[in-house]
Amino acid sequence: MVLLYTPKQKTNNVQTITADILDLDYQGLGVAKINGKTWFIENALPHEKVECRILEDKRQYGHATAKKWRVKSSERLEPKCAHFMRCGGCQGQHIPIEMQRKAKQSALFKRLSKLQSEPISFQPMICGDAWAYRRRVRLSLWFNPNTKQIDMGFRQKNTNDLIPVQSCEVAEPAINYLLPKLTALLEKFSTPKQLGHIELVAADNGVAMLLRYTKNLAEIDRTLLLKFAEQEKLMLFLQSDKGIEQIYGDAPYYQFSDGIKLHFDIRDFIQVNSALNERMINTALDWLELSQQDCVLDLFCGMGNFTLPLAKRVKSAVGIEGVFEMVQKAAQNAARNQIKNIEFFQADLDQSFVEQPWANQSFNKILLDPPRSGAAFALNALCELKAEKILYVSCNPATLVRDAEILCDFGYKIEKSAVIDMFPHTGHLESITLFTTK
């Protein structure tokens, strides 16, 4: 007897909810309450009624994405980018910029206000242009077997699929100018399958470009790249498994209005928003009320983004960074700018630094700009220095609140705070907060 196999029909397990949106959180998600549970809903605005697909359903909260609108907000905007909600770069192009900023301010102020009874001076948001602000982009490359061509673009949200792009609404004009030219260049490559990705950085002395490849680059392709770099006046870098080599152009740098130049390598971390970076630094200098009598410590200093401007205004400055190569670059930047009242040291700031020789110095003011994980491991030793002012630059409100609570327990109070709108149309919340002794 022959048994015939009949496959079971697949069932549709997609779960949906209908929600009335009450508020907007700082990440650009609509907030709803259903049977006492809080739901965070993508692509939804206050006063909208939406049908949503559930993405995550936990005991105390849920995450969903809007699929159909029964009621739409009159404030909803048409996104500028055709790839919005597919590309993972922007989350808030449908939200008016003032609404985005208000949600971020409200989130920070509510969290910090719970930490102390004394009033906090919440300052106006530090903001700039909402579009064309990114000076760095990373573009994935994929050989399309159907067209036999290279596709260049951004990864689709939550997948490895590629969205080909010819422009990006939040990238600087110098980067957008190059995108169609790069597409045309890649079509000429003899060995397109071995290409990985491209990074573009709009430095103040031109655009730096890095091409990642996985196998030996054919000489004909290398020549194509060199001619392109010469024609477009690029600083060209190639990256293989052996490392990175610069094959054309000068070293990239960015420059502050006071004349300080910071040279960097193509893969080094730099703030992507050039204008807001300088405004953030100027705010830090202003809030610290610097004088020629001050001795300042800069923790998580990188290559000297804050340290060099600090040193020009004080008696002495010391920068601490965990990555030795960045310590070297910071020292080189100080030497290039002829700033001599400055020292840099390597230290793991995920551990106590009380035994470090530089920690025996006297610092009356401290600045720290930690990663998203915050600075909890450094705070005990930091507080032992008994500085009169501590300025904390944060890229994560959760770790800022955690660390602020530690500082308050050590006898500091929050004097003032402000949101920095470093990344418009995204859920990132950058802030600057000043702590003083009680």
Curated annotation (Swiss-Prot):
Residues 8-68 form the TRAM domain. Keywords: 4Fe-4S, Iron, Iron-sulfur, Metal-binding, Methyltransferase, rRNA processing, S-adenosyl-L-methionine, Transferase. The active site is at C395. InterPro entries: 23S_rRNA_MeTrfase_RlmD, MeTrfase_TrmA_AS, MeTrfase_TrmA_CS, NA-bd_OB-fold, SAM-dependent_MTases_sf, TRAM_dom, U5_MeTrfase_fam. Signal peptide: none annotated. S-adenosyl-L-methionine binds at Q271, F300, N305, E321, D348, D369. GO terms for molecular function: 4 iron, 4 sulfur cluster binding; iron ion binding; RNA binding; rRNA (uridine-C5-)-methyltransferase activity. Disulfide bonds: none annotated. Its EC number is 2.1.1.190. It is an enzyme of class 2 (transferase). [4Fe-4S] cluster binds at C81, C87, C90, C168. CDD domains: AdoMet_MTases (cd02440). Belongs to the class I-like SAM-binding methyltransferase superfamily. RNA M5U methyltransferase family. RlmD subfamily. This is 23S rRNA (uracil(1939)-C(5))-methyltransferase RlmD.
